[in-house]
Amino acid sequence: MIWTFVILIAVIVGWYWYEGDWDRRLFKAQPGSVCANLNAGQANAWLREHPETQVLDVRSSGEFEGGALPGAVNISIGESSFETKVAALNKDKPVLVYCAGGFRSRKAVIVLKQLGFRNIQHIHRGYMSWQPDSQP
């Protein structure tokens, strides 16, 4: 019985550590890097300080209709025309990208980088981390 408990605790601790480490390895944000990984509060501050930011929601249209960040443009990463539509955005302006939980938007960041966007901000944990009091 005690070994079951020990193994269970080890699995939980290992999973928790791996999840955090996976986030850090997959999505490093360093000063001067092409992309910054922001929490909801930091994203809110960014939007206040940079009102010219293009807010890109890469969730499905159904998710977008259920609620979105103020001023967001919805271009679903699941669309076959995603790259074409994103390429029409202004590459000289900052882009704040998000999805529901942070996974799809990470894929979008890669596409944005490949298309030549230089100032990309990403909301870590996505829309689910956005609270009403986080709004600008």
Across the structure, where does each feature detected by a protein language model lie?
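Rhodanese-like catalytic fold shared by cysteine-dependent sulfurtransferases
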Residues: 1-49, 53, 61-94, 100-136
